[in-house]
Structure formats: structure tokens, C-alpha cells
């Protein structure tokens, strides 16, 4: 519970980015980064490679996993199908329900794919500001596996797909940076599901998820300004229901934080993976429309460019908006009303 209060205070500090200049942002970032590292050292809990583990699932037996490391990668040699890496967020582990559901969705979507659930439970279950710093090392260790598969086992980089939620979305950014640093090649696609915002909004670009971390950086925003990153930070950003709060989730004042409200407080944040799992299973639904803002989307003052959120091949760029239902199925038909932008152009 203490870590939850710390998280809330640090979020407030990190959220004043509009009131401080870039130099102050950098100063704040380095202060908290050094404090987090010192806390980690005092606790004698540095991130080690054995704290980042990998669990492979295939359609041969989708309920059973194979733990993999550098000693048993032969089955990946010259593998030509998609390899999906799923990465959890703060205080989670590989046993998180959303990972199981999304793993199954990917295996249904592509029966020949491999899905690897990444577990970084110990580094993720520390004070939030320490776990936020741990994302760099976790990303580095995951990237090491990808580079090994790419350089030594003939896996085409185009087969890699990285999906992360919350702090896992920020981990995904560090994977992309490290892969590019070690291979001089970009990963094809990163999908960040409501990537963590607190203590990342004030970071320089090289210290957080950004659009240069892969050829396509797809971001799904559902709780921006609270637990998620508020602003566009990918090559394509989906702002679901405006990107900050979700229908069907209870509105709670942060001043009322007590143990009993932690679950509903996280509802908006968790909708990102619920929406994306549904989009995977229904790839022609969850259609979003390109628009300059949520306000303009609501009055149909938008371009006619649309894309389903479950399109894993899109190279479209920009900000896209969509509405959902309060409960599953979340997909809502895109309005067929007239476009004010087209009307005004006549």
C-alpha cells in the first residue's frame, strides 16, 4: 500500500511538465533516477539477468510452456513465423490474467506463431520509482535474447513483435533502443498498451518509449494523465474514448485512495489490454478514425482515414480515435455520419 501512495505523489510531481522548462525536467529526472538506484543498492536488489525469464507457448500445446534461455534455442533456428513477446507491468508477473488471454488470442490469430511471455516479477514488484528505473535493465536483457536469435539462429527481425502494458510498454521501448544499438537495425513493430506515464513524462526521449524505437510504434491510450502516458508517443496512437477515461469504469478521486479502491482505480489503465485482446480476435472491428483531437472526432470533423486497432500490418501514422461500449464486446460501429471537414471543403 505504501508503494501506491509513493506512486501517486511521484505522479503528481511528474505531471507538472507544463510548468517547468526542459532543463528542470532533466534535473528532476536525474535526481529521481539517482535516488532510485541508491534505494535499489541499499536494498541490495539490483536487476540481474536471471530475474528476467521467458516462457514459450505454441499451438502444439497452448496450455503448457517451455522455459527458454540461451541454452535451448535450437527450435528457433531459421524460424519463419511470428514471435510475439508479451511483457507485463508494475506489480504483475507472468501469471497475470491478461497475459494468458492475449497469449491465447495471438495463437488463435496465427496458428504457426510462437508466443513468449516475459516474466520480470521481482524487478516489477518494488517501489514504483525503483521499478520504473529497472525497466532499462529489463529491456536490455530481453533485447539480448532477440539479438541472439537474430544473429546466431537466423531469425528474421521482421518476425519479432513486442507487446507491453504499462511499465511493460516502457520496457518495450528500451528493447527497441538496445536492439538498434547492437544490430544497427530497427525492430519492425512495438505495441505499447497504455504505457506508463508517471516518471516518464519528464524524461528525455532516449529514456522513454518514443516513435523511433521501432519502424512502427503503436500505442493504445486508455488512462493518459493518470497511470498512462498522456501524449502521442508512437508512430500511430489510438486514443480510445479520448484516451484518459473509459466507459464502465468508476470515477474515483485520487484523494480517496484506500486499499478497497485500487482495483476500480486501475480499470481505465487495464482496459488497454482488454480492448486489444478483443481487437486481435476481431481484426476488422475496433475501427479508429484519424483526427486532430477527441473534440473534433466527436463532431466528425475528421479525415476519412480509418484503421482497425487489430491491424498488425498497418503503416499509417498519426492520432486515431474510437469509441467503445461499456462492457464486452467493446467494439462499436464507426459512425457513418457526414464529415464536417468534407462539408466545409465544398
Regions flagged by a language model, labelled:
Residues 171-175:
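Hydrolases whose catalytic domains are alpha/beta-hydrolase-1, hotdog thioesterase
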Residues 188-199, 221-225, 243:
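Active-site nucleophile loop of the alpha/beta-hydrolase fold
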Amino acid at each position: 500500500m505504501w508503494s501506491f501512495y509513493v506512486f501517486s505523489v511521484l505522479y503528481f510531481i511528474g505531471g507538472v511538465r507544463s510548468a517547468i522548462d526542459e532543463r528542470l525536467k532533466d534535473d528532476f529526472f536525474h535526481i529521481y533516477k539517482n535516488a532510485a538506484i541508491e534505494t535499489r543498492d541499499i536494498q541490495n536488489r539490483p536487476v540481474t539477468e536471471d530475474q528476467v525469464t521467458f516462457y514459450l507457448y505454441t499451438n502444439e500445446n497452448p496450455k503448457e510452456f517451455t522455459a527458454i534461455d540461451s541454452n535451448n534455442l535450437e527450435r528457433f533456428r531459421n524460424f519463419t513465423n511470428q514471435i510475439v513477446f508479451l511483457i507485463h507491468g508494475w506489480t504483475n508477473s507472468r501469471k497475470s490474467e491478461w497475459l494468458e488471454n492475449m497469449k491465447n488470442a495471438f495463437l488463435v490469430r496465427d496458428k504457426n506463431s510462437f508466443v513468449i511471455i516475459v516474466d520480470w516479477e521481482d524487478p516489477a514488484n518494488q517501489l514504483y520509482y525503483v521499478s520504473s528505473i529497472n525497466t532499462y535493465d529489463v529491456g536490455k536483457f530481453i533485447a539480448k535474447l532477440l539479438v541472439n536469435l537474430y544473429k546466431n539462429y537466423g531469425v528474421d527481425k521482421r518476425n519479432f513483435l513486442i507487446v507491453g502494458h504499462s511499465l511493460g510498454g516502457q520496457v518495450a521501448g528500451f528493447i527497441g533502443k538496445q536492439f538498434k544499438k547492437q544490430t544497427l537495425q530497427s525492430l519492425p513493430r512495438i505495441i505499447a498498451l497504455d504505457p506508463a506515464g508517471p516518471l516518464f513524462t519528464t524524461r528525455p526521449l532516449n529514456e522513454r518509449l518514443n516513435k523511433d524505437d521501432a519502424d512502427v510504434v503503436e500505442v493504445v491510450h486508455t488512462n493518459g494523465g493518470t497511470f498512462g502516458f498522456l501524449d502521442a508517443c508512437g508512430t500511430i496512437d489510438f486514443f480510445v474514448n479520448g484516451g484518459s477515461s473509459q466507459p464502465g469504469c468508476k470515477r474515483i478521486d485520487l484523494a480517496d485512495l484506500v486499499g478497497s479502491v485500487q482495483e476500480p482505480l486501475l480499470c481505465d489503465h487495464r482496459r488497454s489490454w482488454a480492448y486489444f485482446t478483443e481487437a486481435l480476435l476481431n481484426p476488422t472491428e475496433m475501427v479508429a478514425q484519424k483526427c486532430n483531437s477527441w473534440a473534433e472526432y466527436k463532431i466528425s470533423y475528421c479525415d476519412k482515414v480509418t484503421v482497425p486497432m487489430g491491424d498488425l500490418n498497418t503503416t499509417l501514422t498519426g492520432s486515431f480515435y474510437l469509441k467503445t461500449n461499456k462492457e464486452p464486446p467493446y467494439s462499436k460501429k464507426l459512425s457513418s455520419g457526414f464529415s464536417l471537414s468534407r462539408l466545409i471543403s465544398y
